[in-house]
Amino acid sequence: MYYIENNDKPRFLENMFKIIKIEGNKLILPLKTKNINKKYLVKLARKTKKILDKTKSKKIVLSKILKENEEYKNILYSYGFDIVDGKWLFEVISCEVLDYIVNLKNIKKEDTEISILVNYITQNTLENIKKIARQYKRLNIVTNHIEKFKKIEEELYNKEGIMIIVNNNKKKSLSKSKIILNIDFPKELLNKYNIYENAILVNIRGNMKIARKRFNGITINDYEIKLNNLDYSQINNKNQYNIRDIYEASFYKTMPYREIVKQINADKLEVTSLYGNNGAIS
């Protein structure tokens, strides 16, 4: 796994010959942040690929600045690189994200209706639903696959006494939910639902905006964390990377859920910020 960042003040020869510095498992690109030529980006991406092909590494973490460069990212994606974006971890810690929201907004858990929007079930998703249902007694699962989730609803109730409601009523399902956790609904599908106008919407997979004019709530698309038992200062000495990306990169995504949670608890993960369309929520 490699980290990639830019040097916005490269020396003349570094810039001219597009020399990529290699420092351990870190690549430093001679890339200024303004007026970047697309051809220059293509050449840098090709050089990046040549270097990483020799290492047989496909997983990469981009610095905050490089993540904003869609051209460079898309070229790397086209080469088949796995660019860590924090979304996998976002779902894994979704219960911690909900706790952060209720504490920040001074919301009582027992009075809060949570809705989870999900169509595709994974082991992590299932375990998270169980975890959230144990803490929030009013939990809706909104899905297009009613039959699949009805089986899960019955199994949770019969085996663990956990009660959830599975439904897909576009007019009523989200009309009273104070917090909505969107696991995998695309924007086009989400905007077909009648959403509580002051809801807090957490989008796990990517940036999204509610199209309805009457929606006055908060849309959360991003987050940051800290790890009280880990020190990333050697990698992130200039705060050029998101901690959540560095941390996600340390996991094998095929790890059993129990082992993932055990590691997160040992590292004392803490959600520090949630970001909406207009910056950090407060």
Label every PLM stretch briefly.
Residues 4-7, 31-32, 62-66, 117-120, ...:
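Structural motif
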